[in-house]
């Protein structure tokens, strides 16, 4: 999988740029604040439909401009695709091969990317919502070729049913049939979501083991789903109908208390991913260095699972990895990426710390949003 060409117009501080990328390492250098991360953000937007900085479309426009436009030409499984993303205040539009797409997440079907930024550490240190988002994205991208209903569709329908039940909880009177209808739908979708998450984590674990070893960690990191159904037995993970029945019963039993609190407390929207290093909670007992390598290993395991699913490696997009890893960590990371043979994008103002031996990088230098190919790394980026 490869991004061959990218055109940007009025994106962040970039007025206009057209870039052709190499099949291996593409190294983006330049002073801080001049557009290195903006370029990676554009690539991530074309691959995932969302900003890795969690910015709305209005914030991505160049100052004073009404809209921005990204266009990427990709090769995936020997097929070419043309991806476009238009954004303006309160509105965005996506086209794939000239046809409008109903959801930005559809971009991932033509361009898969694994993105590593300093914020990746949030997988370990932040609350359950960040980890749920991670496993849901992996379940969507790694399950989309199996013919089953997309995890993204299931998750979207679940959120609609959840909002509907939460509205019922605030009403003074509700007919029994209405409770039954929404709770049955919520339980069925919730069981499907929980099972999808459980299955993708089962597939992710062996890849995580290998990536940790490649990154030089002797400890074992386990990632498990903490689900409310666990206390009622583990059989739910293998039996979707049993999980749905359990959810229906729990929703009915907790209806009175949830009416008092005003929100649904039962369901996969309350799940978490438990990360343990040699049996100990990583967030509480892991060192900063261990947490950083563990978070990186999770993203690399995601990439390997994608490769297993798609038959080719996704793009690797790394924003200033040298700021998060020591010399040994960088050497191991770049060696691992070189062995993968996929297309890599690295932005760094510490170019001298990137061990690119064997990767033959294509180098870009950016100055105030203007990009140029360069044979040498300018001294101010060293």
Swiss-Prot record:
Annotated Pfam families: SMC_N (PF02463)
Keywords of this entry: ATP-binding, Cytoplasm, DNA damage, DNA repair, DNA replication, DNA-binding, Nucleotide-binding, SOS response
Subcellular location(s) per record: Cytoplasm
Main subcellular localisation: cytoplasm
Residues reported to bind ATP: 30-37
PROSITE patterns listed in its UniProt record: RECF_1
InterPro entries: DNA-binding_RecF, DNA-binding_RecF_CS, P-loop_NTPase, RecF/RecN/SMC_N, RecF_2
Gene3D superfamilies to which the protein is assigned, alphabetical: P-loop containing nucleotide triphosphate hydrolases (3.40.50.300), RecF/RecN/SMC, N-terminal domain (1.20.1050.90)
GO molecular function per UniProt: ATP binding; single-stranded DNA binding
Name of encoding gene: recF
GO cellular component: cytoplasm
Annotated family: Belongs to the RecF family.
Listed GO biological process terms: DNA replication; DNA synthesis involved in DNA repair; double-strand break repair; SOS response
Origin superkingdom: Bacteria
Protein name: DNA replication and repair protein RecF
NCBIfam families on file: recf (TIGR00611)
Function as written in the Swiss-Prot or TrEMBL entry: The RecF protein is involved in DNA metabolism; it is required for DNA replication and normal SOS inducibility. RecF binds preferentially to single-stranded, linear DNA. It also seems to bind ATP.
